[in-house]
Amino acid sequence: MDDSTHAAEAVIATPAGNRTVRFETGRLARQAAGSAVAYLGDTMVLSATTVSKQPKEQLDFFPLTVDVEERMYAAGRIPGSFFRREGRPSEDAILTCRLIDRPLRPSFAKGLRNEIQVVATVLALDPDTLYDVVAINAASASTTLSGLPFTGPIGATRVGYVDGEWIAFPTHAELARATFDMVVAGRVVEDGSDVAIMMVEAEATPGTVELIAGGAPAPTEEVVAAGLEAAKPAIRELCRAQSELASLAGKAATREFPVFIDHHDDVLEALSAAVGDELSAALRIAGKSERENELDRVRQLAAEKVAAQFEGREKEIGAAYRALTKKLVRSRIVTEGVRIDGRSTTEIRELSAEVDYIPRVHGSALFERGETQILGVTTLAMLRMEQTVDTLNPDRTKRYMHNYNFPPYSTGETGRVGSPKRREIGHGALAERALLPVLPSREEFPYAIRQVSEALGSNGSTSMGSVCASTLSLLNAGVPLKAPVAGIAMGLVHADDAYVTLTDILGAEDAYGDMDFKVAGTRDFVTALQLDTKLDGIPASVLASALQQARGARLAILDVMAEAIGSPDEMSAHAPRVISVKIPVDKIGEVIGPKGKMINQIQADSGAEITVEDDGTIYIGAADGTSAETARSAINAIANPQMPEVGERYLGTIVKITNFGAFVSLTPGRDGLLHVSKLKTLSGGKRVEKVEDVLTVGQKLQVEITEIDARGKISLSPSAEAADAAAAS
């Protein structure tokens, strides 16, 4: 490849106007095996692909690593961390890593064991665009230029469903009017006749329900399938531009890399003859535990029978055994339409749903689908507890936080327990996106919400189980969801140009199948979906059929969930009570007071926590409703006051004593003067020389308004009750 700069453009026509993605190579990162810069507007992403010189022969997997580096200077900002520099990757960066990895990984030659690293660095960010799809295209371009055995290029586009039309590469403003947001990656098939879909990541938007209520079309299965088709022209154009760039740059011929075959045919044939029948019988055992115990026995028997014949090739025996297992599982599905546990291709495992499972927490639920078991737990808090995020994303806070935990015991294994891995972050983000469209607004439900999904047992799609458990838990916590959401994972087996779609896949079907297609939604529309495939691509028509098959399963799951809880429960007695009050913006300063004196006093007197928003909305949180109402009354007395009248009585607090009397606080921000001459009734009718002899600061005293002058100054006298109490003492 020469050192001059080369460029190619992809121009994508959309109903909102043309979008241009520009690719460049030859100027930056020249020492990488392949490097490319992709532009969308002012967004600029540099991707560099490198490869190790020697293979890692001991590995039994493909060592591909994808990293995304968010540089805060891209948005003209300094990192908010203590050291003021970028640290560990943000959640957005990790999710973008996964978006890049998923279509790239199946596109490399099988058996490759050289370490490959793709690093995408965000150098500039246009405030109108998201960088994730730009990074996918940049990564594909740099890998295409690297000379690696790669079946790309891969094109990726975001399409938004806005006003009944699919728009490629929508801006933030357009996404705000969209009912569905979808990232689609794919490649042009060898004969150029079609675009095969390799990866999909999609969700309804937070405003979807309101937009539908306003007349916008809902993102049904048919609409989503049309979106996959709408993405194809953009993907084709992006692939064309990347191929043009490679041609202009004089891309080197694909280099030779050693490919390590897991096993040779003679080992597979020997194993098939030795234990094929026993393995086939073991795979027909429905229960996971019993099946795996028998499979372990057959695996050991297989090793004993062929070990002597293939001495020194033990690794091949293990790989061949896995290949034989995969072959038998897939063959039975295709020929008999029967799966490992005896179900048909459209059958769902036994379902169970239970709410209010854990004491004292604000909301909880246990959802089970076969051997997959998810515990959902909801915690509510004041809005000040929402998460602050320091990323390139324009949203700086997260009110709804979904955490997913996958402990090793969920699969009966030992392992590391600690900070979440990329997979856990990805699963939590998927469940979060599935539920965001049905969450109430801040005004409707002024709480920060943390949802935790504990995968206690795993045998297929814990992420979709998390969606179901979370819906149940949120309703149990009293969160007024706009609609319940359920999810299901679909699988695929491809053989001889036939595609068999599987509903509710097991872990083994995920491992031995060709697709993991997760679909979540309400009864009326899809809220989230995610596609991963091990194939070079899947026809959009197959995915459209899988969407329809998933809908039937989703409705069945929603019926079971509705039996457990059909509407939001009363909030837990242990959850905080949050109410809101609106005040004029010019009264905010009075409520806060000098150096926070007034608001701190209200919090101390009421026991409530108070958060003041810039628009005059005040959120009041307390352990009980009485404390919250006390704080609200105090705030209203300052910001939305009713003028006191002569003759009204108050239980006031002595706040200041002078030589001429005492100042009494009637309500926050409103004091009156109790003159020394009025204190006779508190001292048996005798003249009071020193106010301190009768009153003390902080003392509560029943007083009555005797006069309000033209300037609003209030004069007080002790009420008859106060005089009687003084006489009795």
UniProtKB/Swiss-Prot annotation:
GO terms for biological process, alphabetical: mRNA catabolic process; RNA processing
Residues the entry annotates as binding Mg(2+): 510, 516
Domain S1 motif, chain residue ranges per copy: 647-719
One term of GO molecular function: 3'-5'-RNA exonuclease activity
Catalytic activity: RNA(n+1) + phosphate = RNA(n) + a ribonucleoside 5'-diphosphate
Subcellular localization(s) per the UniProt record: Cytoplasm
Residue ranges of every copy of the KH domain listed in the record: 576-635
Any Pfam family hit: RNase_PH
Alphabetized UniProt keyword annotations: Cytoplasm, Magnesium, Metal-binding, Nucleotidyltransferase, RNA-binding, Transferase
Domain of life: Bacteria
InterPro entries with a match to the protein in the record: ExoRNase_PH_dom1 (IPR001247), ExoRNase_PH_dom2_sf (IPR036345), GPSI/PNP (IPR014069), KH_dom (IPR004087), KH_dom_type_1 (IPR004088), KH_dom_type_1_sf (IPR036612), NA-bd_OB-fold (IPR012340), PNPase (IPR012162)
Transmembrane segments: none
GO-annotated cellular components: cytosol
Listed EC numbers: 2.7.7.8
Cofactor dependence: Mg(2+)
PANTHER family: POLYRIBONUCLEOTIDE NUCLEOTIDYLTRANSFERASE (PTHR11252), POLYRIBONUCLEOTIDE NUCLEOTIDYLTRANSFERASE 1, MITOCHONDRIAL (PTHR11252:SF0)
Family to which the UniProt record says this protein belongs: Belongs to the polyribonucleotide nucleotidyltransferase family.
Its job: Involved in mRNA degradation. Catalyzes the phosphorolysis of single-stranded polyribonucleotides processively in the 3'- to 5'-direction.
Name of this protein: Polyribonucleotide nucleotidyltransferase
